[in-house]
């Protein structure tokens, strides 16, 4: 059985890849402190235990239902002093946009990353939170007790975003990445009008 036998499937638990459900648990246990919810399209009744790769911990966390929400515009984030940034199935692309807001970001330890993550520093650009969110309450209490330091973290994140995450700098990153990859090609690329485009 398993991945190598006649029945193919995922071997091992996958609950660790659904951290947004853990934020819902914090909402239920600390109303007013954490405001997390689930959009209707995130929960599919079609996904059964077999498809999730069942284990007891996953079952508990997937049953933790936060309040159902309607999708709000990104500008709604401007009303919060703190933002909790957790991954989805991979790194969430929202972080760059959230950093522009100047709010203090509580960023979950991530198993995946975007191109700018190596430049970020915990306690300088964000408040680090364990992947399990087990220390979220502790970090929230720290931020409330050290409001000035927490606000400064948000300001530094905003300054970082303005310098490194604007349209021009992101385009520069992609230009350099694709140029470096082009140098590694062991062949000359085909060009011409018959391909439907012309190189600049």
State where each predicted segment sits.
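Phosphate-/polyanion-interacting regions in eukaryotic proteins
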Residues: 1-70
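Catalytic binding pocket for nucleotide-activated donors in carbohydrate/polymer assembly enzymes
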Residues: 71-199
């Amino acid at each position: 059985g398993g991945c190598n036998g006649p029945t193919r499937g995922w071997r091992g638990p996958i609950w660790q890849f659904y951290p947004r459900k853990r934020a819902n648990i914090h909402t239920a246990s600390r109303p007013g402190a954490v405001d997390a919810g689930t959009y209707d399209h995130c929960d599919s009744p079609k996904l059964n235990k077999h498809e999730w790769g069942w284990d007891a911990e996953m079952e508990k966390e997937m049953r933790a239902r936060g309040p159902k929400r309607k999708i709000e515009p990104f500008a709604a984030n401007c009303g919060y002093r703190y933002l909790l940034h957790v991954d989805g199935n991979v790194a969430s692309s929202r972080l760059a946009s959230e950093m522009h807001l100047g709010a203090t970001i509580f960023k979950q330890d991530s198993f995946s990353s975007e191109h700018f993550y190596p430049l970020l520093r915990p306690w300088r650009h964000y408040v680090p939170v364990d992947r399990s969110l087990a220390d979220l309450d502790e970090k929230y209490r720290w931020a409330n007790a050290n409001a000035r330091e927490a606000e400064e973290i948000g300001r530094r994140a905003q300054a970082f975003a303005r310098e490194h995450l604007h349209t021009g700098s992101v385009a520069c990153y992609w230009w350099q990445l694709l140029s470096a990859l082009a140098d590694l090609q062991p062949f000359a690329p085909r060009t011409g009008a018959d391909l439907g485009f012309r190189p600049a």
